[in-house]
Curated annotation (Swiss-Prot):
Signal peptide: none annotated. It is found in: Cell inner membrane. The chain crosses the membrane at residues 4-24, 385-405. Its main location: membrane. It comes from the Bacteria. InterPro entries: DUF445, UCP032178. The keyword Cell membrane applies. This is UPF0754 membrane protein Tery_3973.
Amino acid sequence: MSNIWLYFVPPIAGGIIGYFTNDIAIKMLFRPYRPYYIFRRKLPFTPGLIPANQERLAKRVADTIMGSLLTPSELQNLARRLLQTERMEAAILWLLQMSLDQLKLNTDTKSTKILANILRDLLGQSLPRLLKVWAKREYFLEAQINQIFDQILLEFQLTEIQAAQLSDWLLKVVVPPDVLRKTLIDFLTDQNISIIDEGFREKASGTYWVVANLFGLRNTLTRLRTFCLDERDLTNQRLMELITALAVKERITEWLHSLSMQNLPVSTVRELRNTMQNSVRLYLQENGTDLIQALSLSVAWEHIADLIINRLQASSIMNSSLELVSRELALILERYLERDLENIVALAIPILNIDQVIIDRIKGTSAEELEVAVNVIVKNELQAIVNLGGVLGVVVGSFQTILLVLQR
């Protein structure tokens, strides 16, 4: 009976010792989680291997990852895969759609005020400075002014109704009979009457010379002036009758209707066009800044911004053009990244500080959590090591049994 125990005890004992030795060794990688003290002296192997060297382990892991895995070239490849044109286009399209949806849902005046301030600064501050510089160029607005002159001014002609209305306004407002009467009185001064009378006497000939030297015009013109002064209403009536009898309104209407730059000589038209260009350019150089600023002050930018936002909210073109805009922006970014991706990654690595993130994450993880994480990853492998220890213990015990048998 004792011989039987002698044969079986070594393999069994070796297996048990090997199994539990490996199991204890694996557990001692993490346990105990904290140090233990006896008489103020720390016990050996407390805490476990990994908790005791967690900071150094974190540094080694970070160095390994940054030195072998996340190298600058690998980060560049990762950035290229992440920033493919299709992905960038989809991201930009999503951002634009989100912005448009937010704009549609926006009910406060924040967006309106921002857009109003942008428009006010653009027209009231930036545009005047640019206009002052542009106006110094010789051919500034030449094509636009020529187009306005050729298509609008050159072909402009009043219709018969417009000419009749303008002539009626001239005779009723600008030069009514009373204005003509006052103008005639102001013209018929004693000096002008004397000049007219002397000129008539000197230049008259034939029967007119007899009339001029016998009667003259002095008395007639003086009496006319006196009549205009004393008989105001009657003079206005006579002037109105004279205007009607001479068909002045019809003549002015006909003249205004036929008035057109196309009837002028070509050289005159060219000169007018050049004069218009120079006048506009000179005016913008001298007064363009004040004009734009005054115009900016007179515009209700909040109202215009509100109209623009409302128009954008209801515009179908905005929705249809988002894909095109996102595609163009993605292509621009792609060309930029092809040129400067290496520099961007080199600048991003210190900013991201990935190695420090890894160190902080490992140092901030408790030993218990590390043990759980390792067991989740290599549970079967660790159990195989434990089992291998038991198998090796059995093998060693079996060799001992064989040696004992041979010694007998």
